[in-house]
C-alpha cells in the first residue's frame, strides 16, 4: 500500500476510524431482528468515500466497475466457502451489483445491510440444521461407507437448493465427529463438545451489532483500493489506539468468552487486578457495577461489551461480581472492588537483552532486540509530547 506520505494515516471521529496501513502496520434460538444502520454510520460512509477519493494514493473512481468489485468482495468476506448463501440469494444480490457506488456516495446502506440480514438468516438455518443432526447422536453417522468432502470451496457453484447445503453440512459434521473419535474422545463427550461449539457460533452471530455489519461492508469497499486500507468501527478504533499506545485505563485483566461467561485469562503484571489479589485466571465475571451503582448482569454478553463496562477513568472504582474458578456451583459468587489505573502494556514494548555465546572456547556477547509488535502513541505524538513512545524511538533509545 502506498499512502500519500507513505506513512499510516489514522482518521478517527465519533463514528469510527479509517486506517491506511503502510505495510509495516500491518438451543433453537429466536430469529434475531434485522440489524439496521444508524445516522452516524450514514455519515461515516459518506466521509469514508470522500477520504478515499481525496487522500488515497490510488485515485480510483467510485463507479460501476468498483461497485461490482465491492459486491464480490462483500460476498467473499461473508461466505468464503459458499456454504450459506443459495444461488437464488446471489441472483437477487446481482440487482445491487452496479448500485453500491451510488449507495455509498449518498450514505445509503440499505443494500449492504440487506445482504447481511440474508446472510444472518442463512447462517442460522445452517446452525439449526447442524444442531438438529447432533441431537440424533452417533447412530446418525455411518463411518463404514465411502464418502468425500470438498474442503476448498472458494470457487464452488452456489447451492441451488437448501438440500445441497444440508448434504454439505452433514458431511462437515460427520468429518468433525470422526476427527474427535480418532483423537480418542467418547461419543458422549464428542456430541456435547460439538453442540457447545455450534451453539456458541450461532449465539456469537446473533450478538453482532450495526457497527460490526457496517465495518464488514465498508471494508469490502476499502479493500478495493488495496488490502491494507481498513475502516475501523469506534470500538475497533479504540482498541487499535490502546494497542498502539501500549496503555489503557482499567483493571489490567485479559478476558475471553467461554460459554455465556466472560472469563479472566490472565492478569497484567503489576496491574490493579493483580495487586488486589482478589482475582485469578479462570474466574468468571457475571455482573459489573460502577462505583456504588447497581450491578449489570453480563452473562451472555459479548466480551467487548463487558470490557466497555470494566474500562473507565483512572482512579474510578469498578465492582465485579465474580464466580471463582474453584466454585462448585453457580451461587458461590463474590464481589470484588478495584480502583482503575493506567495500565502499561510493557510486555508488548521493544525489549533488549545481551546473550553470551561460547564458540571455540571463546565468549561472545550478542545484543538481541525483540519487537513483539509495532506501536506508536498517536495521541501523545499529535499533542506534541516530546517523550511519546514508538517502536522506532524505543529501539533507538
Residue spans of the language-model regions?
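Solvent-exposed, polar/charged alpha-helical surfaces in well-ordered, non-transmembrane soluble domains
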Residues: 42-46, 50, 64, 68-76, ...
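PDZ/PDZ-like domain segments forming the peptide/carboxylate-binding groove
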Residues: 76-77, 98, 112, 117-128, ...
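Extended, small/polar residue-biased N-terminal targeting/export presequences
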Residues: 62-68, 72-148, 202-257, 317-319, ...
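AAA+ P-loop NTPase catalytic core
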Residues: 157, 166-226, 230, 237
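Bacterial N-terminal signal peptides
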Residues: 12-20
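Cleft-lining beta-strand/loop regions that shape enzyme active-site pockets
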Residues: 2, 27-37, 53-63, 203-210, ...
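Bacterial N-terminal signal peptides that target proteins for export
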Residues: 2-11
Amino acid at each position: 500500500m502506498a499512502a500519500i506520505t507513505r506513512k499510516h494515516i489514522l482518521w478517527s471521529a465519533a463514528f469510527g476510524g479509517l486506517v491506511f496501513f503502510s505495510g509495516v502496520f500491518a438451543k433453537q434460538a429466536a430469529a434475531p431482528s434485522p440489524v439496521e444502520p444508524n445516522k452516524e454510520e450514514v455519515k461515516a460512509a459518506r466521509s469514508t468515500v470522500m477520504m478515499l477519493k481525496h487522500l488515497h494514493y490510488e485515485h480510483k473512481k467510485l463507479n460501476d466497475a468498483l461497485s461490482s468489485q465491492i459486491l464480490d468482495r462483500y460476498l467473499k468476506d461473508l461466505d468464503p466457502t459458499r456454504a450459506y448463501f443459495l444461488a437464488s440469494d446471489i441472483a437477487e444480490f446481482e440487482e445491487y451489483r452496479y448500485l453500491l457506488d451510488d449507495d455509498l456516495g449518498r450514505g445509503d446502506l440499505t443494500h449492504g445491510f440487506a445482504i447481511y440480514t440474508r446472510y444472518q438468516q442463512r447462517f442460522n438455518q445452517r446452525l439449526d440444521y447442524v444442531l438438529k443432526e447432533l441431537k440424533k447422536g452417533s447412530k446418525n453417522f455411518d463411518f463404514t461407507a465411502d464418502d468425500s468432502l470438498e474442503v476448498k470451496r472458494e470457487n464452488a457453484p452456489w447451492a441451488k437448493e437448501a438440500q445441497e447445503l444440508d448434504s454439505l453440512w452433514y458431511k462437515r459434521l460427520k468429518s468433525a465427529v470422526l476427527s474427535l473419535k480418532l483423537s480418542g474422545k467418547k461419543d458422549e463427550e464428542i456430541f456435547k463438545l460439538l453442540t457447545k461449539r455450534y451453539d456458541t457460533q450461532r449465539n456469537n452471530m446473533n450478538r453482532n451489532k450495526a457497527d460490526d455489519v457496517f465495518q464488514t461492508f465498508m471494508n469490502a469497499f476499502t479493500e478495493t483500493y488495496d488490502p491494507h486500507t481498513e475502516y475501523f468501527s469506534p470500538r475497533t478504533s479504540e482498541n487499535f489506539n490502546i494497542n498502539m499506545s501500549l496503555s489503557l485505563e482499567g483493571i489490567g485483566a485479559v478476558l475471553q468468552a467461554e460459554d455465556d461467561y466472560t472469563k479472566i485469562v490472565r492478569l497484567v503484571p503489576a496491574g490493579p487486578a493483580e495487586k488486589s489479589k482478589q482475582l485469578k485466571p479462570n474466574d468468571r465475571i457475571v455482573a459489573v457495577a460502577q462505583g456504588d451503582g447497581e450491578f449489570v448482569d453480563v452473562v451472555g454478553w459479548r466480551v467487548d461489551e463487558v470490557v466497555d463496562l470494566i474500562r473507565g477513568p483512572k482512579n474510578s472504582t469498578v465492582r465485579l461480581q465474580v464466580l471463582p474458578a474453584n466454585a462448585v456451583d453457580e451461587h458461590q459468587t463474590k464481589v470484588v472492588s478495584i480502583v482503575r489505573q493506567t495500565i502499561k502494556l510493557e510486555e508488548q514494548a521493544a525489549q533488549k537483552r545481551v546473550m553470551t555465546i561460547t564458540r571455540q572456547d571463546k565468549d561472545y556477547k550478542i545484543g538481541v532486540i525483540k519487537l513483539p509488535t509495532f506501536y506508536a502513541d498517536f495521541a501523545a505524538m499529535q499533542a506534541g509530547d516530546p517523550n511519546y513512545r514508538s517502536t522506532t524511538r524505543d529501539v533507538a533509545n
